[in-house]
């Protein structure tokens, strides 16, 4: 446990947006799950946020279940972390509305992610524009002190800090100002050599198996250097992916084979395929077991929601009192 995370309340949210791939795993998921052994962790499935891009009920429901299965299979332990659906804590929407009343339009208009998503063809909905306020509510309602994020989310954390500061100046010191921890960047090339991304269609899925996985790995783009010739591992996508899984000794051994010549890229791809299967085999089996017991997964999410709502309700009572409302709505 690092000094930075010790004693912190850590919040991490993931949008249910499809199948996990190696870029997701090494870029964020693995790091976030490991944090459960550090501070007090809250992990939520951001299904409210997902509505900005997913407008099919069956798709959203299935994607949400997939995220739960993925994270639990990859090692998220509900005994160590609070794991729940965002939509099971409706208080977050009440807080988002209250926060919106102290948030200037100019702050939202500067949101880079909104502009980028609209440029990519996503509908410029009010919900998409409002996204940073709901994200601020997600963070503040659990009184989070640390949020692990990638570079593309830093602005949203800074906006949350601004919104919390404005609220505190208006109504008193209610919210701790959250900090963030940048995810360690991992260079994860896709099968075409570009950054691995769903939008490029170049991913290797974590839970793919058998022929589909083999076809994907064996299809990684390489140069045309002959089998007998030495090769430069630093310029090879296969070696870059292999290095994410291998020990230093294993990397050194494969590097020597590259530089010595006599090894084709097909052999390197088979070594990578073996590593991928070795690394994820236990998680794949666990995911299958969990998928056969959906009631158990639902129980985990409900238990997490009960714990999360306790925190959310305590915060919203403080907020309602601070702004001049009754602690609880009159029924």
Spans of model-derived segments:
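A generic secondary-structure signal for well-formed alpha-helical elements
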Residues: 68, 75, 103-106, 144, ...
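Internal, conserved structured core segments that host functional sites
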Residues: 114-163, 167, 171
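Short helix-capping/linker segments at secondary-structure and domain boundaries
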Residues: 105-109, 141-148, 246-254, 284
């Amino acid at each position: 446990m690092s000094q930075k995370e010790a004693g912190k309340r850590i919040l991490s949210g993931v949008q249910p947006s499809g199948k996990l791939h190696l870029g997701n795993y090494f870029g964020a998921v693995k790091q976030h799950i490991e944090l459960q052994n550090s501070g007090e962790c809250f992990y939520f499935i951001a299904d409210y946020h997902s509505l900005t891009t997913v407008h099919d009920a069956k798709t959203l429901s299935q994607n949400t279940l997939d995220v739960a299965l993925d994270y639990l299979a990859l090692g998220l332990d509900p005994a160590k972390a609070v794991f729940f659906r965002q939509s099971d804590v409706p208080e977050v929407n009440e807080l988002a509305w209250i926060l919106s009343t102290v948030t200037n339009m100019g702050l939202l208009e500067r949101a880079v992610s909104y502009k980028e998503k609209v440029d990519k063809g996503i509908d410029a909905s009010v919900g998409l524009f409002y996204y940073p306020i709901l994200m601020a509510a997600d963070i503040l309602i659990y009184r989070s002190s640390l949020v692990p994020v990638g570079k593309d989310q830093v602005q949203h954390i800074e906006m949350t800090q601004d919104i919390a500061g404005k609220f505190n100046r208006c109504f008193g010191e209610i919210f701790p100002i959250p900090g963030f921890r940048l995810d360690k960047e991992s260079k994860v090339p896709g099968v075409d050599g570009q950054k691995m991304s769903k939008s490029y269609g170049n991913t290797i899925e974590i839970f793919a198996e058998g022929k589909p996985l083999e076809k994907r790995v064996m299809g990684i783009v390489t140069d045309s250097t002959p089998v007998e010739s030495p090769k430069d591992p630093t310029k090879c996508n296969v070696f870059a992916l292999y290095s994410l899984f291998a020990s230093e000794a294993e990397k050194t051994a494969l590097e020597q084979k590259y530089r010595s010549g006599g090894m084709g890229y097909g052999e390197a791809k088979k070594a990578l395929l073996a590593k991928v299967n070795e690394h994820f085999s236990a998680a794949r089996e666990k995911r299958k077991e969990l998928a056969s017991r959906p009631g158990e997964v639902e129980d985990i999410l409900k238990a997490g929601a009960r714990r999360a709502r306790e925190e959310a309700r305590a915060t919203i009572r403080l907020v309602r009192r601070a702004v001049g409302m009754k602690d609880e709505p009159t029924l």
